[in-house]
Amino acid sequence: MICSKVPVRAWFATLGLGCLGLVAVGMALQTLLHLAPCPLCIFQRLLYIMIGFVGLLGFVLPAGRLLWSTLAAGLGVLGFGVAAYQTWMQAFPDLAPECGFTDPNAIERLVDWLGMEWPSMFLATGFCTSRDWELLGLSMANWSVLIFAGIVAYAVLLFVRKDRA
């Protein structure tokens, strides 16, 4: 199998740089298209950053491959759940509790705090049910579901592959 000849460090570097690249693309779209991210969007952004750093840690410390791939998979599963919930909110906006109009949950409190500390990166000003941007008929939340599923599959492959630093 040709993939097994690629060093594990390269796989982790791809994961890390890919996730950080997704954050950069999201920031560019937000700025250029004047999009207003919601608390769930910002939390997904935070998860992409965390997975990116886990990938870079795997690049620097490839001996911890099992730990790094498990962390990436766990964060990916969490991201998948958040993105799927936002996708549901966008599909059924009449049934969805809108972010910001109820008592804040742990995610909203974290996002609010991050937004005060680094507003250009983490300030949530949008609504979770809005579909302001679409590509090929899929909203950004829909794309995040697919991307997080891919990250989980990628992390599982990193976990089960033969060790080759």
From Swiss-Prot:
Q: Which Pfam families match?
A: DsbB
Cytoplasmic-side stretches of the chain, per the record, are 1-11, 62-66, 162-165
Q: Establish whether keyword Chaperone is in the entry.
A: yes
Q: Which GO terms describe its molecular function?
A: electron transfer activity; protein-disulfide reductase activity
Q: Highest taxon of the source?
A: Bacteria
List the GO cellular component terms.
plasma membrane
TM segments?
Answer: 12-28, 47-61, 67-84, 143-161
Q: Which residues lie on this side of the membrane: Periplasmic?
A: 29-46, 85-142
Q: How does it sit in the membrane?
A: Multi-pass membrane protein
Q: Which cysteines are joined by disulfide bonds?
A: C38-C41, C99-C128
Q: Which GO terms describe its biological process?
A: protein folding
Does the keyword field hold Chaperone?
yes
Could you tell me where this protein is found in the cell?
Cell inner membrane
Keywords from the UniProt entry: Cell inner membrane, Cell membrane, Chaperone, Disulfide bond, Electron transport, Membrane, Oxidoreductase, Redox-active center, Transmembrane, Transmembrane helix, Transport
Family of the protein in this entry: Belongs to the DsbB family.
Q: What does this protein do?
A: Required for disulfide bond formation in some periplasmic proteins. Acts by oxidizing the DsbA protein.
This protein is called what?
Disulfide bond formation protein B
**Organism of provenance:** Dechloromonas aromatica (strain RCB)
Originating gene? dsbB
